[in-house]
């Protein structure tokens, strides 16, 4: 899980981000989490 939150992928370090994501995404695989973070980046880029 944490490999998707490394410094290269998530530029902003938010306290508790990994714990909050773990609580809100039970049963997600690594691929699911990667897709979630990619979609979030795309949406942020559009704004």
UniProtKB/Swiss-Prot annotation:
Pfam families assigned: AAA_lid_3
Membrane topology: Multi-pass membrane protein
Primary residence: plastid
Location of the protein in the cell: Plastid, Chloroplast membrane
Cofactor(s) needed: Zn(2+)
Enzyme class: hydrolase
GO cellular component: chloroplast membrane
GO biological process: cell division; proteolysis
Functional summary from the UniProt entry: Seems to act as an ATP-dependent zinc metallopeptidase.
Protein name: ATP-dependent zinc metalloprotease FTSH, chloroplastic
């Amino acid at each position: 899980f944490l490999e998707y939150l490394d410094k290269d992928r998530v530029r902003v370090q938010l306290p508790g981000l990994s714990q909050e994501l773990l609580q809100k995404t039970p049963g997600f695989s690594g691929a699911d989490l990667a897709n979630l973070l990619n979609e979030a980046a795309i949406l942020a880029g559009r704004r």
